[in-house]
């Protein structure tokens, strides 16, 4: 466990994620251990991850069109709760935390909870990009508040830097910078490229049009239509009529439609897209660091791999202080995360992913 630079006098119990282990695993109402998470299925791709990936595209276009000045830049803050020597780092591996939020608050003192936390590791050693998603319901210690809570609460208590501090403290990896994107950016981007063509089913149109409060007074009609940004966002958020798997399929449909539209867009449209969407992105990287990060990522983009925290067989559902959470074996997750980011080659990960796909 990293050594805190500020003393914490609160007594630690088996509920504290810094000390929880298999021997402290909770039991269900029948006195039996709950099922451990297998994690064999891919983590669901939420709308906020969708927006985060779009933010990367905007930064890429922004570097080429000179509109990065419209991005909000914050001063970089070092973690005061853990010393750098206790964090795993390598100058040849760049770690940037991407945060997806429902809306960025105008009052910087009170950030909203982060819906998505994805660590992008550009590994110049093994020439690959490694993406690690952190589930928001993981029960962790939040150092800025000196308390344990769900991981996504770290943003509310400590802002974007608070999320970085919390992940570093609990999982022992150095995070160099963060990038934040919100849902408003998605709408602006779609409108900037003139909308996206999507085929809407009768059930989807009925769900959105019939629930104005849920979808912001948006109207959809069945059939193939060119959707505005607001309509496309409502379409991506549909979830009541089917499963999460179908919802993520809708999101991929829109994502592909956006990429297709961008490929056929002229330079002026791409400039307009980047210029309009850039104000909805926030980071603690300078312009030069942003462009450097994009350049390094481009050199490694031929190989990409994904992981999720918690890793398979390292977690279980629990109820703590009335909260339904994901309890984890923290030391095992820390070990596997460091191994994934810094040690594993692309060939090793290809074999692991192929084996997992067969199970």
Which functions belong to the PLM regions below?
Residues 2-359:
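Non-catalytic, solvent-exposed segments at the cell envelope interface
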